[in-house]
Amino acid sequence: IISVSPALFRPEEGKHYSVGIHPWETGATPDFELLERAAAHPSVAAIGETGVDRLRGAGIDTQTDVFRRHIALSESLRKPLILHVVKALDIILAVKKECRPAMPWIWHGFRGNATMAKQLADNGILLSLGSHFNTDAAASIPADKLLVETDESTAGINETAARIAACRHISLPEVIALASENLQRAVAYTV
């Protein structure tokens, strides 16, 4: 899934996308109409990146309001939500508890520890690991909550998956199968 902002969304045949107003882009007035149009496109499999970043972007209240709009869109279109979160776990979990979404949430680029991974998994959030991750967390994430990503890394997906496999003491094909099944289940509502 390729993550793009609504303004840059130019779908190509055979590719799947997520569209969202990234927390870093919440300082300008967000164009929710453009987001809604792009999100409704059949090649869009997920909504986001969205969430709250305490280190960058507009104020927390603005980011949280934009996040809630993304949640509503995710629910109305029945597409999973991709999260970008920095030092805002408390806000994300409070909003999730309040909104009680039916659609899956995917924590993009998860770098937290095993305790945080358990807390998120217990709240039904899938955890996507990129090239930088906590090895104890990678070993402890429940099998049905594990995803693998490349993001902007030069490391290929297989290289990242192999490192995760080593942490979990399983084979590379097993990690790829787990992550593939989990992604298929997460986007099953849309494709």
Ranges and model annotations:
Residues 1-191:
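Mid-domain alpha/beta scaffold segments of enzyme catalytic cores
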